Amino acid sequence: MGHATDLRLYPTFGEVRQPLTLSATNGRAVHEQTFSQAAWNLIEPGSLSFFGAPVVRIESWPTDLEWLSTQEGQPVRILRAGQAPLEATLVRASDLLVRLSSGEYLSVGREELAFSALPPRDGVQVRVEVAAQARVAGELSYRTAALSWQPRYELGAGGTQAQLAALAEIRNLGGETYDAGQAELFAGEVRQVSPGGLLSEQQSGAGLAGKTGTATSASLNLAASPVTGLGEVRGLQRYALAGGLTLRPGERLNVPFVQATLTGFTRYGRIMGYFDRQERSGRASRHYKFTPGQSLPTGPLTVREDGALVGTLQMPATQAGRPVDLDLGADNELRYVRTVKQLAQEKNPAGKVLSTTFRVTYALTSTKSAVVRVQVREQVYGRPLAVDGKAVQGQQITAERGVEVPAGGQASVTFTLKLGAG
């Protein structure tokens, strides 16, 4: 059964904040609560806190320990696979020491014991004691891996236009119901300390691509979003979910996320490589580029062209007004052959090579039904001196050229490169 709570949901966990009103006696107020063993196993160790009054102590213990103590001196059976049941008496509950009917003593596992009395459910009892003089209003807080969220995006392209739709997928992987009067979503990089003391950095959506719950239509049309942006908190994006929410055990809830606006949408092909003297051939990669009107957290993205699925990938976190470039994979309809020709060498009077000039050519062939813009980028390492006759500086430069390849046609890109002797 769930408690009335406030929820703060992060990429890989949720913070539960349970409002409480406690009455104090002799300067102390106490709250006790029982968690099922399954729920407790998902709670981050050391995350239990109380806000609203000074904490005196927070204790937790298995609920079955007290009951086991009442069974000391009572007959039990030991059940082991492939063996006949053993009759015994429980001697000590703390380490499950039993005395066999034959007189020997044996420590056993909890799962091996059968009792004549009905045992309680496995769970953990939590006791919070705070300093207070009268009534105190506060919150019991803990973090649980049962709760998380991620944005899911769908880019629908047609002609020269594209629209980006977004859903917020909220998950409850646990067996408890959460009834939240207030719910907030946080996105961004969250650094946590594990129980072993190691730092881990989690990014919204990381490792979750493809784990989507509700299928989307060819053109994802969404109602008004209940999610409102609240700005940022120390580099984390913060959103409020209007009206709170109720999450049942195992539920995945999808609601419309922020309404994203796009400008500058374009499709193009890209060829990227590095300079060497070898001939190469291959395929260009398919790229979509656009500029979002607002910052968006990272999340899985489905791309559709006139309703047809053409790719899925993880969209990186975006910043308002900064272009986003998406690589959808190789384009079988757009291929290239790269050739390199040595044009000249410069030597000193002693015959030592000072520089060598090369011509690099990309011959592009398209079997596509429309003209396509192709961007060729080549990384040059070593001692580049000039590109197309223009002097350059640095040990690493990028030679970049663009060309339009006609439908069902060919085009070429050429540049010259002067390299100093290594």
Predicted features and spans:
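Long, intrinsically disordered, low-complexity accessory segments associated with secretion
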Residues: M1-G422
